[in-house]
Structures are given as C-alpha cells and as structure tokens.
C-alpha cells in the first residue's frame, strides 16, 4: 500500500528550507503531495499558479511527488480525500512547534486517521522564512543561497532586480 503524505504551506516563495523538508519526507513516504494553501487572508507576492509552476519545476524529478492547490476547506478533510496518512510540517524553532502542535491536535480531532510528522530542516535553513526572503529580495539583497535558481529568477522578475546587483 502506498504511503501518502501531504506537505501543506503557502510557499510564497518555496525556499531551500521547504525543499529540504520535502526531500526528508520523500525519504520516508512513497508519495508526497505539496499542497499550496490558498489563503485569502495572506497578501502573497506570487499567485497560486506561479507558486505551483515554480514548485513543480523543483520537485518534478522526485518519484511520487506532485503539487496541488487547496482552494478552500479543511486540511484534515483534504488528507482524507487523497488518502494521506500523514501531514508533514517543517519545524525550525520552538515558536513553530507550539503553533504546529496545536494544529496537529486539531487535525487529529478532525481526522483521526492522519498523523502529523514534524521534520526539522538542515540547521543552515533554520532561520530561512519566505517572508524574510521576500523582504531581502525586495531590498536588492542576494538570496541565491536560500532559494532554487528558478525561484530566484522569478523573484528578480517581480522586483526588477538584475542578478548580482541591488536595486539601489
């Protein structure tokens, strides 16, 4: 039986920290579905379609990997719908864990068949967050160590920044 996990997030943008957690999950589960949460309360830089395209280019070479969008509804219900037995969450610090632990308990109540699996990224990504990447890129900083080249290109397009040059 195929063990399916879902890896949800906004992924605006998908960072090397996200990729690291995805790769770790891929070593545990037969199939990992990256689920882009469309959250109308968040003001995102990239559209859902842009995020999907970027992530598909990055994870497309992994067996059992796919990208889907959760437009509305509960993650616990989505997990049931796709037959996922696990929800993968990356945890960088204690603050992340506190929030994710609460969400894990809620998801368990809503869907007792799904388990949340907490994975820590490589230590070099523990301070990397999409919001920080967006801000540094917007200010012309070099983020090439924190995102895939295809994401870097899209950030440059969004912020009209030439590679290796700041916008000042």
Curated annotation (Swiss-Prot):
Record's subcellular location: Cytoplasm
Cofactor(s) demanded: Mg(2+)
Similarity-based family: Belongs to the bacterial CoaD family.
Organism of derivation: Prosthecochloris aestuarii (strain DSM 271 / SK 413)
Pathway: Cofactor biosynthesis; coenzyme A biosynthesis; CoA from (R)-pantothenate: step 4/5
Catalytic activity: (R)-4'-phosphopantetheine + ATP + H(+) = 3'-dephospho-CoA + diphosphate
One of the protein's GO biological processes: coenzyme A biosynthetic process
Name of this chain's protein: Phosphopantetheine adenylyltransferase
One Gene Ontology molecular-function label: ATP binding
Cellular component aspect of the GO annotation: cytoplasm
